[in-house]
């Protein structure tokens, strides 16, 4: 199907990519009982709120710089094995602080994993620092300040994730101003759990180059046209959207409608093992569930490289590999 195609992923949360087998090994290492959040190699949750709790439980078994290097390298090697040439990982230095590891050690572990994976397979990767909306504006601003001041060359963008129903986008706008002034690429989660208004607010108040998900924009034809006119890129994660019941099934998912309306769309996996998916599956779904041709899928991959937060020399090299 799509195994012969090069792949790019712009939207994946690092801890959300933790393979259950690795999480189980980590839990045994730290003597953590996994029954509350994992059974038979499957992460357990029922709705978005429970998903966030499960996500945090899984994250708790990754505790050291070495743990994060291992997690990062493991996921990137998985991607490289299916023909992925570039990945952006959404990471949270604030999480490093919360678990007592520290933001710097957390980021160094992740960065070491990126370097190790690149040395083995040649895969390129960058880091998107995220603030988590449900922890409030001050924490999101702190995350932006961390990203803005960091001298880590792998940090290339800033994002806001978490519980979309908490607070107004306006409450968090300062964080994005800080990141933008530092030259970081700007993306934001919107239009996933909440409707088209969430995307409209993000466009108006944050002015992002990209939007994580953004699929609920389909509910407002004028907004869809605006996204197309602006060239705003959507990081679409169909498997995640179905798993979270954003849409009931793939025939009702608007990926093709958005693309046909001129919106620039890309394909990602979000939190793959939580949603019983993978980047490989997302590309296959583009073919089987949405009916995209190889040329159309390659065009979305090209869009992802064009929209990636990275230097122009690396972008040109990646485009040459398609």
Swiss-Prot record:
EC number: 3.5.4.2
InterPro entries for the chain: A_deaminase_dom, ADE, Ado/ade_deaminase, Metal_Hydrolase
Residues that bind Zn(2+): 11, 13, 189, 270
Annotated cofactor note: Binds 1 zinc ion per subunit.
Keyword Transmembrane helix annotated: no
Keyword vocabulary terms for this entry: Hydrolase, Metal-binding, Nucleotide metabolism, Zinc
Catalytic activity: adenine + H2O + H(+) = hypoxanthine + NH4(+)
Enzyme class of the recorded protein, top EC level: hydrolase
Domain of life: Bacteria
The keyword Metal-binding belongs to this UniProt entry's keyword annotation: yes
Active site: 192 (proton donor)
PANTHER family for this protein: ADENINE DEAMINASE (PTHR43114:SF6)
The family this protein is said to belong to: Belongs to the metallo-dependent hydrolases superfamily. Adenosine and AMP deaminases family. Adenine deaminase type 2 subfamily.
Function: Catalyzes the hydrolytic deamination of adenine to hypoxanthine. Plays an important role in the purine salvage pathway and in nitrogen catabolism.
The name this protein goes by in its record: Adenine deaminase
